[in-house]
Every structure is written in C-alpha cells, then in structure tokens.
UniProtKB/Swiss-Prot annotation:
Gene field: uvrC
Highest taxon in the source lineage: Bacteria
Biological function: The UvrABC repair system catalyzes the recognition and processing of DNA lesions. UvrC both incises the 5' and 3' sides of the lesion. The N-terminal half is responsible for the 3' incision and the C-terminal half is responsible for the 5' incision.
Coiled coil ranges: none
Keywords assigned by UniProt, alphabetized: Cytoplasm, DNA damage, DNA excision, DNA repair, Excision nuclease, SOS response
Pfam family, one: HHH_5
GO annotation (BP), single: nucleotide-excision repair
Protein name, entry field: UvrABC system protein C
Occurrences of domain UVR (ranges): 208-243
Length: 612
C-alpha cells in the first residue's frame, strides 16, 4: 500500500538531477529527519518512494516527509564528507535507524593537561571524549599519512595515555626522531605546547602562520644559545615549506565561501558553499522573497552584509569569498571585515581553477534550489486551491488559523494558534496562550479561553479576522468556538472541526463545517486533506513545544523555589555547580555541602526537600 505523505514526490523527482550529492529530508515543521548521500541523486531518492520492497522503518520516514533539500557535489567522496558534517551538525533522528554501520576516520587531539597526543580514531555520529576531532578524512590511509607527517615535523606523541604514564625511558619513536619524549621529561611543557599549537594550526591549514611563528622561535632559541632547539625548529621550517610548495602544486584550497545567485520574477535564491581546508563542510540556500535592489551586485552585497555581520555565518569568516557577480561595494565590505574582525578577506568574482569549480557548483545548487522552491510554491498553491474547492469556498480565502491544546494530565496547559496563507505558514502571526484558572484537563474551557483571548483583540486590530478557523476536535470543540463567536458578536468566519477517525490514523479525519452544518470525509489521497493535516500537525507541534517548555520551567521552579533559604543567588550557584535540577536531586548530602555559599544547615534543607 502506498504511504500517505503530504510531499509531492512525483513532481519533485521529475526535475531532480542525476548528479552526485547530499539530500536532506524534512518534516512539516522544517526539522531534518534524515541526511543521505548518493552517487545518483535521482535514483537514490526515488528508491524511498517505491510501492514495494520498502522496509517498515523507511515507510515510517516517508510518511513524515514534507520537503527535501539537495546539495550537488563534484563527487561521491565529497558527498560522503558533506553528509558526515551535516549529520554531526543536525543530528537527524532517522540517521540512527537507517544509516549503515560505517564509521569515519579522524585525527583525535586528546585532552591531556601537559602533553596531549594525536591519534587515529574511527567514530560514528556521536564522538566521545573531551578532546578535539579533525576530519572526517576520505580514508584511513589519509589519516595515517597526516599523522606520519605530523610526527616527522612536530614530534608529537601518538601513544595511548596508559603507555605514556608508565615509561621510564624513551621509546623507539624518540630514537628515530619522531617523538620529543615528553614521557621522561626530555621536553618542557611550554615547548611541547608550542609544537602542539603548530600541529593544530597545520591541521587547520594555517601553514604560513606556523612558518612565521617558528622562524621567530628559532631566532629566539639561537639568541639564547639553545642551538639544539634552534636546529629542530629549522628542520620544521624546511619541512613546512616543502609541504606548502606541494600543496600549491596540487591546488589545495584555502578557507573559501562561494556564493551564487539565481532568481526569477518573484524569488531570489543565494546559495552558499562553505569550503574549509579544501573540503566542502556545508552548504545552505537562502530565499529572498522581496527584491528591493535591481542589480544582482547590489543584492548580493546587501545579502553578504547581513550574513556576516548578523551572526548568520555558522562557519565563521573565511580567508576568501568568491561570488558569481561583482559586488558594488566590495571595498567597503573588505574595510568592514578589517574594522570589525581585524581580518583581511579576499573578495573575487573572476576566478579560475579550483575556485571556479566551487563557484560553478554553488551556481548549480542555487539553480536547483530555485527550481525546487518554485515547484514547491506551485504545489502549495495547488493544495490551497484544492482545499477551497473541496469545501466549496471562494477563491478569495487568504488566511486560515488553527488551534490545538496540549497538557500532561492537566499540568501546564498551553493552547496554540498557527496561521497559514496560500503560500504556506505565516509564522509571524503564530501565538501561544498559557491557560489559567480552568479545571485540570478540561480541553473545552482551555479552548474557550484561547479563542476569547485571541479574537477579542483581533476583531478590532489591523490584522483583521481570518477567513477560516480549524479546531482540532469534533463537534464539542466546534460548539465551544460557536459560543465564543456569538459572545464576541463575530460573523463571517467559517469554523471547521477536524476530528480524527476511530483508528486515529491520518487519512481518516472527519470535517464538521459550521457554514452549512455539513459533515465531510475527504479521500486519503486528497491534496486538500493533506493541507489540512499539515496545518493541524503544525498547530499540534507548536502547542506541545510550548507545553513542554512551561512544564519544565514549572517543575524546575517548584522544587528549588520552595526550599526555605534559597534565593535567586543560591539557586543560580546550585544550578551552575550541578548543571541541572535533576543532578541536584541525585546529589548526596556531602556533594551539596561542597557548593560554595551553601552551609551545612542549608544543604540538609535542600537534600530533605528532594528526598522526604
């Protein structure tokens, strides 16, 4: 049986590229469900929507898909690395269920206080340990090659802590010049820290900075007549210069942000491709619906100004920015980078070689994103029209609002109101209502309070009333809405109750329509029903998120704030020390006594509050 989904897979797949890349599957809330890579995007994504041969887990994923975003890459290897970075950043829930058991090779910098090590690690999505990870690398061989080079240049230890702690004399690595033997004190912590700092900079691709610093340290060592140390530093400089020359020959990229622009009459897409040390670590499409600038150079300049100075640059400021069009205020932007960040950033649009390839890739992704978004908007408009037709409504319907109530056995009751128009959600008009002074678990009175608070203000405001109000519930909730509107003397708004079927499965909903007191059951594959489900599910998400926040806040406050002698300062000290109320609850009396500013008497009072 074909899975029910609000996503129009057929239209999406029709225009999907066959090139390699990464795909991100998202639900109706815009949250990423799953990230995957593909040698052929069209073939791979199509496989999820087959009618046969699909696992139960995959079918459950497909039922939740509301949108799919893609990023085109040069190769499958590049797609693999980008996939891993996105999984690490986004932590999609279905990747735990659907990804294979493959792990990726990293270089791991340990957290040892004086003498940290660099070692080979294979890790999955959640990396353990307090140290720092560099990677992922394309292969284990690439990691081992990098580690061998780091040993040769910086002589950083690569042994395990247990081996390091039990040495009484240097090992073979020291004898062949690949370790400075910190285990037996043949290098002081300060010198080792300098070598480790340079090794870290090397992994970050900052070779010119290392060379300059090392030359300065070599000159200082010579002036202090420490010729042995000076010779070691001289060899490091020689190695680094050779590596730098080799990288220049191979065309290894610096840290680059590549931006491309694609536009239609109604929509502009700017796609950013983020390259760090020669690898694509991320990408993102930005949609600009209102175009005030007529020139592409003006538009991209305005966008970059907001992107870098508005705290949107999640990968930081790069060494270089490349764009598909020349920026009208390039010099002003470079001067602003220098003034605000004290960084000299190169900005170019006429580029060659690797930079041209990155820019071409960004342009390909921008074009694809524009095509997908325009098709998505067309599909949304079609769903809206289907919704109006199915309910025999006029085409002039511009706004639908939907309400839901969420609580846990009457605790922290919150009602939500979400707003949709022909082009989708209008999140600026969303509202939550913390319900007060109603019997615990009484959804009817909670809905009455939310509707009264919403429309007693809205009926006289500039925003105006919606055309349709959806109530998540059957005749009972719809009756409450009628009662509120009669009391507020509001007319001209169509009220619709959305009741789940007996099985409570999507596709079995019953609609109670107030305009003519009719009852409507739409078929499960109806695009009108898909839109109603999308709006209702969004109202549910918005309500339950608000409820959980209120519940957690209430539970956090109720225990600590009720303890005699605990004011704002002591409460803050306790939370800073333990990290959470749950950890305070788990703590022993002796552990509570150790908190600065908490006396033995207060500690006993706190412990008793949680355990009696």
């Amino acid at each position: 049986m074909e899975s029910q989904s609000i996503f129009d897979a057929k239209s999406f797949l029709k225009q999907l590229t066959t090139r390699p890349g990464v795909y991100r599957m998202m639900d109706a809330r815009g949250e990423v469900l799953y990230v995957g890579k593909a040698r052929n995007l069209k073939n791979r994504v199509s496989s999820y929507f087959r009618n046969t041969g699909v696992s139960i887990k995959t079918r459950a994923l497909v039922e939740k898909i509301a949108d799919i975003e893609i990023t085109i890459t040069h190769s499958e290897t590049e797609a693999l690395l980008l996939e891993q970075n996105l999984i690490k950043t986004l932590k999609p829930p279905y990747n735990i269920l659907l990804r294979d058991d493959k792990s990726y090779p990293y270089i791991y910098l340990s957290s040892h206080d004086e003498y940290p090590s660099l070692t080979f690690r294979r890790v999955r999505q959640k990396k353990t340990g307090k140290g720092r990870f560099f990677g992922p690398y394309t292969s284990a061989a690439a990691v081992r090659e990098s580690l061998a080079l780091l040993q040769k240049i910086f002589r950083i230890r690569q042994c395990e802590d247990s081996f390091f702690s039990n040495r009484s004399r240097p090992c073979l690595q020291h004898q062949i010049g690949r370790c400075s033997a910190p285990c037996v004190g043949l290098i002081d912590p300060q010198s080792y820290a300098e070598d480790m700092s340079h090794a870290t900079m090397f992994l970050e691709g900052r070779n010119p900075e290392i060379i300059n610093e090392t030359i300065q340290q070599m000159e200082v060592a010579s002036a202090q007549l420490d010729f042995e140390r000076a010779a070691v530093l001289r060899d490091q400089v020689d190695y680094l210069r050779r590596v730098q020359e080799q990288q220049a020959i191979e065309g290894v990229a610096r840290d680059i942000d590549a931006f491309a622009l694609s536009s239609s009459l109604e929509l502009v897409v700017v796609h950013g491709l983020f390259i760090r040390a020669g690898r694509v670590v991320g990408s993102k499409s930005f949609y600009l619906s209102e175009r005030l600038e007529s020139d592409d150079g003006d538009l991209l300049s305005s966008f970059l100004n907001q992107y870098y100075f508005g705290e949107h640059a999640i990968y930081g400021l790069p060494q270089e920015i490349t764009t598909t069009v020349g920026l009208t205020d390039k010099d002003a932007l470079k001067a602003a980078f220098k003034e605000v960040f004290n960084r000299n950033v190169r900005i170019e649009h006429n580029v060659r070689s690797n930079r041209a390839e990155w820019l071409h890739l960004a342009q390909t992704n921008a074009n694809q994103a524009l095509s997908t978004r325009m098709q998505s908007q067309d599909a949304q408009l079609q769903r809206w029209q289907s919704f109006c037709d199915a309910l025999n409504l006029e085409a002039s319907v511009k706004r639908v609002e939907c309400f839901d109530v969420s609580h846990t056995f009457g605790e922290a009751t919150v009602a939500s109101c979400v707003v949709f128009g022909p082009e989708g959600a209008i999140k600026d008009l969303y509202r939550r209502y913390n319900i007060k002074d109603v019997p615990a678990g009484d959804d009817y009175h909670a809905m009455e309070q939310a509707l009264t608070r919403r429309y007693s203000k809205l009926k006289d405001s500039d925003v105006g009333l919606p055309d349709i109000i959806l109530i998540d519930g059957g005749k009972g909730q719809l009756g409450i809405a009628h009662q509120v509107f009669d009391e507020l003397q509001i007319t001209g708004v169509t009220l619709i109750g959305v009741a789940k079927g007996v099985t409570r499965k999507p596709g079995m909903e019953t609609l109670f329509i107030s305009a003519d007191n009719s009852i409507l059951n739409l078929p499960g594959d109806s695009t009108a029903l898909h839109l109603i489900q999308q709006i209702r599910d969004e109202a549910h998400r918005f309500a339950i998120t608000g409820h959980r926040n209120q519940r957690n806040k209430k539970r956090t406050q109720s225990v600590l704030d009720a303890v005699p002698g605990i004011g704002p300062k002591r409460r803050r000290d306790l939370l800073n020390y333990f990290g959470s109320v749950r950890n305070i609850e788990r703590a022993s009396l002796e552990e509570i006594k150790r908190v600065p500013g908490i006396s033995e008497v207060i500690a006993q009072t706190i412990y008793a509050a949680f355990h009696e």
